[in-house]
C-alpha cells in the first residue's frame, strides 16, 4: 500500500489522465486517485494503469473528464478502489466505484468495503464437487445443464433474447431458490438497465439482488472495471457468508471492448482484429476469481454478444475457453417464434455426462439431439421433394422432431406483459418425463401446436383437448 500523497494533472487525453507527483510519492499500479472536477464539483476517481517516467503516472478515469484542466490537484488515496459489500448492499443499485445510483436517500448500512482487485482463491481453497443448478427452463435443464459454481456463456447476435433469458434466470433463482444474485450491466443500454430494475421491483426479487451498472454512455474505464465491482460483492457472500451466489454479466463482450479502448488510449499496439494484446490476461483475471471454494460458490452467467454472428472473433473465442456450458441463441429459432431461442444442437455442457446427471437424463437428452439432427439432415430432401417422398420411419421422425422443437419453447415470466402468456417454471424431472414420453411415441396423435409455449407435458395434453374443441 503506497502512502497518501498529492500530485498535479499533467495531460488529459479523453478518458486518460497523466498525473505528476513529487519525487518518492509515486502511487502503486491500480491505486485510486481522486480529483475534484471544477465543472461539476464532484469527485472523479482515476485508476493508475502505467508509470510513464519523470515521476508521472498514466491513469484511466472512471467518469467523464469534461471540465478537467492541467495543474488541478490530485490526491492519492493510497489504496485500490473499494466498494461496499454485505447484506446492506442488497436491493440497491451502484456504479463502478460503489456509489448508490438508485436515487434512494437511505444511507447504506451494514456493509464492509473491499478492494476490487484481488488474487483468485488458491488451488487448495477451490472445491471440485459437481452439482446441477435447476433453472426451470426446459431446453437448458435438458440439453445444457448448468453446474453449480460453474461459468455459463449465452452466445448470440443482436436481438435474439440474451437479456430476457438472463432476467428470467434472476427471477427463477430469487423466487424458486431464494438465492442472492449480483448483476453487472457492462456497456449495455441504460434503458434495459432501468427496465430490469423496475421489473425486479415489480416481481419483488430486488431484495435478493445487487445491481451494478457501467452502461454504454460511460467512459471505457467504468465499463472495464464494473464487472470486478459486482464480482467483489459476490465474493463477500461466498467467502464470508458461505453462500451459493449467482453473478450475471451482461455483456462480457463489452468488457473486452472497453479493455480494447483503454488499451489503445494507453498506447499499446493492437493485436488480432484490433483487440488489445492483453486480451487473454484481462479475461483470465476476471474469470479465475469466479469459482467455487470450500465455503460457497459463485455461478456465473455471462451474456456474450457475437459481433456479426462470427463465433471465431477473438472476443467470444477467448471467452469460450473459460466456460463449463455454452447456450447458443439462434436467429433461425427466434425467427420461427421458438422462444427461448436456444439452439438445441449447438448448446453444450460439460455436465451432460451420465455419471453426473444420471443415465435417464443423459439418454433422453441424447435421444432429443439425435432426432433433431436427423430432422435437420432431412430438411434438404423435404425442401426439394416434399414430405411424400420420405419413408414412413422418416415421416415419424419429422413429426416427433417438430413436436420436440415446439416443446423446447416455453413462456417466460419476465415477458408476460408482451406475450400475455403466464410464465412457467418446469422442474427438471418433469422436463425429462415430457421429452421421454414424446420420444417413446406416446403423443404421436396430438397436433404439434399443442406443444408450443407450454410448461409441462400435461399442459400440452390439456392444450390439445382445447384445440380439438375449437
Curated annotation (Swiss-Prot):
Catalytic activity: ATP + H2O + 4 H(+)(in) = ADP + phosphate + 5 H(+)(out)
Enzyme class: translocase
GO MF, any single term: ATP binding
One GO CC term on file: plasma membrane
InterPro entries with a match to the protein in the record: AAA+_ATPase, ATP-synt_VA_C, ATP_synth_F1_bsu, ATPase_a/bsu_AS, ATPase_alpha/beta_chains, ATPase_F1/V1/A1_a/bsu_N, ATPase_F1/V1/A1_a/bsu_N_sf, ATPase_F1/V1/A1_a/bsu_nucl-bd
Major site of localization recorded for this protein: membrane
Localization per record: Cell inner membrane
Lineage: Bacteria, Thermotogati, Thermotogota, Thermotogae, Thermotogales
Official protein name in the record: ATP synthase subunit beta
Family annotation (HAMAP family): ATP_synth_beta_bact
Amino acid at each position: 500500500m503506497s502512502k497518501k500523497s498529492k500530485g498535479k494533472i499533467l495531460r488529459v487525453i479523453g478518458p486518460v489522465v497523466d498525473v505528476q507527483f513529487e519525487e518518492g510519492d509515486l502511487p502503486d499500479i491500480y491505486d485510486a486517485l481522486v480529483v475534484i472536477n471544477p465543472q461539476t464539483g464532484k469527485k472523479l476517481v482515476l485508476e493508475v494503469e502505467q508509470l510513464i517516467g519523470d515521476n508521472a503516472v498514466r491513469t484511466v478515469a472512471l467518469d467523464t473528464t469534461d471540465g478537467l484542466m492541467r495543474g488541478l490537484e490530485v490526491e492519492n488515496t493510497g489504496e485500490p478502489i473499494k466498494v461496499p459489500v454485505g447484506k446492506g448492499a442488497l436491493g440497491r443499485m451502484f456504479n463502478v466505484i460503489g456509489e448508490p445510483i438508485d436515487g434512494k436517500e437511505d444511507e447504506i448500512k451494514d456493509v464492509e468495503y473491499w478492494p476490487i482487485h484481488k488474487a483468485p482463491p488458491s488451488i487448495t481453497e477451490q472445491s471440485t464437487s459437481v452439482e446441477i443448478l435447476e433453472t426451470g427452463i426446459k431446453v437448458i435443464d435438458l440439453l445444457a445443464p448448468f453446474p453449480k459454481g460453474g461459468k455459463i456463456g449465452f452466445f448470440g447476435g443482436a436481438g435474439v433474447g440474451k437479456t430476457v433469458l438472463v432476467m428470467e434466470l434472476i427471477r427463477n433463482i430469487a423466487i424458486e431458490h431464494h438465492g442472492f444474485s449480483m448483476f453487472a450491466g457492462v456497456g449495455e443500454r441504460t434503458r434495459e438497465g432501468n427496465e430490469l430494475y423496475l421489473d425486479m421491483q415489480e416481481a419483488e426479487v430486488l431484495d435478493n439482488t445487487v445491481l451494478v451498472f457501467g452502461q454504454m454512455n460511460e467512459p471505457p474505464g467504468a465499463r472495464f472495471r464494473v464487472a470486478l465491482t459486482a464480482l467483489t460483492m459476490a465474493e463477500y457472500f461466498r467467502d464470508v457468508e458461505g453462500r451459493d451466489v449467482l453473478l450475471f454479466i451482461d455483456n462480457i463482450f463489452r468488457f473486452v471492448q472497453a479493455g480494447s479502448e483503454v488499451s489503445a488510449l494507453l498506447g499499446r499496439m493492437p493485436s488480432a482484429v484490433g483487440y488489445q494484446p492483453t486480451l487473454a490476461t484481462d479475461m483470465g483475471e476476471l474469470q479465475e476469481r469466479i469459482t467455487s471454494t470450500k465455503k460457497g460458490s459463485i455461478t456465473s452467467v455471462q451474456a456474450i454478444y457475437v459481433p456479426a454472428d462470427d463465433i471465431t472473433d477473438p472476443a467470444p473465442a477467448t471467452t469460450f475457453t473459460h466456460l463449463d456450458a455454452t447456450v447458443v441463441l439462434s436467429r433461425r429459432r427466434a425467427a420461427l417464434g421458438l422462444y427461448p431461442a436456444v439452439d438445441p444442437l449447438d448448446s453444450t455442457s460439460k455436465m451432460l455426462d451420465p455419471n453426473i446427471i444420471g443415465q435417464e437424463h443423459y439418454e433422453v437428452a441424447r435421444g432429443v439431439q439425435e432426432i433433431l439432427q436427423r430432422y435437420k439432415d432431412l430438411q434438404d430432401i423435404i425442401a426439394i421433394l416434399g414430405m411424400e417422398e420420405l419413408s414412413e420411419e422418416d415421416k415419424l421422425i419429422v413429426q416427433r422432431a417438430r413436436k420436440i422443437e415446439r416443446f423446447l419453447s416455453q413462456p417466460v415470466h419476465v415477458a408476460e406483459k408482451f406475450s400475455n402468456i403466464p410464465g412457467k417454471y418446469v422442474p427438471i424431472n418433469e422436463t425429462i418425463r415430457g421429452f421421454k414420453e414424446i420420444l417413446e411415441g406416446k403423443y404421436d396423435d396430438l397436433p404439434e401446436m399443442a406443444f408450443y409455449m407450454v410448461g409441462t407435458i400435461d399442459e400440452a395434453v390439456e392444450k390439445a383437448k382445447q384445440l380439438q374443441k375449437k
